[in-house]
Amino acid sequence: MFGKKSSAQTVLILDIENGSVASALLKLAPGEAPRLFGEARIAVPLMDTRSAHSLARAVEHAASESLLHASEVAARLRHHAGALPPVSKVVIFMAAPWGVPNLAQGRPDFTPAFQELAPRIRSLFGDVPTSLHAHASAAVHGLRAAYPHEERALLLSVNGEVSELLMLEDARVVGHATAPVGLGTVLRTLKSHAGQSEHEARSAMRLGAQTEAGQAAAAHFAGEFKHAARELFGGQASGNVFVLAHEPASEWFARSLSHRSLAELFPQGGTVRAMRPGHLAPFVAHHGTPDTHLLLDALYTSASLAHGRGN
């Protein structure tokens, strides 16, 4: 008489990184693939000089904008497609340095930054449950889903100013390190060495132009990777490397790891592969051009809630 109550739920995903912030609505319903709506990513302005304080302020501002955008999208979707339930949960993913795995404790460590987000969430979505996760957890979960037979690998997650290295053995994370290098580092190198604008520098990365400045940027990135990886490996390097970066830069960073200076890290050789949206798209329904990191977050959130870990 009254109809069957839908058990579908809408989750807000907030992806906080050190070069951008993204948000998306995730619809979860029994028997259906998780579905993303209203994905949007806000880039943090590229700084000429790096400052932890100014970066944190810029990221917090972008996070506030992302929450406002998500609330507006949720309102429009409820108006035009009433089947989408109201947001019942907020899941926040934080990349280094905001959220990092603590392998000794078996749980992530989170920075106390972004204190203003909690009241912002309440003002826009009400008193809904909120959970925090390290983005590294979502990245590893997605790697296992896309490449279930790769039990020993190194995952390099490239971000704006800080990159993360995760070493997997028997499909478990056994090592974690960070490197103070990312997309921002490369763009600044191209701007200063080649006199390019930020737009030109991004285009050069997308086109893979082999300029002197581009080679210098790749060599610098490879050097920082080598320094972090050498301490992480302990002489047990895996030749299977996966690179996670925002498109269209993933292939550029993957190619940079073919630099000759890295040969000693992988004496047995190996492969370097970019994790692309196409590797994850079969697991998550979406509209338009998918965002690799949001796909990872959606896949992890769906699995976490299904197994009761998302509370």
Where in this protein do the model-derived segments appear?
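Nucleotide/phosphate-binding catalytic cleft detector across ATP-hydrolyzing
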Residues: 1-18, 24-35, 41-153, 170-174, ...
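Short, acidic/turn-prone active-site loops that include or flank metal/cofactor-
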Residues: 136-138, 179-184, 271
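Generic beta-strand/beta-sheet core signal
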Residues: 168, 244-246, 275-277
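Metal-dependent catalytic core segments for phosphate chemistry
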Residues: 26, 30-38, 180-203
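Nucleotide-binding motor/catalytic cores of P-loop/tubulin-like NTPases across gene-expression machines
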Residues: 254-294
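A mobile "lid/hinge" subdomain adjacent to the ATP/sugar-phosphate binding pocket shared
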Residues: 191-227, 248
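Glycine-rich phosphate-binding loop of actin/hexokinase-like ATP-binding domains
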Residues: 152-189
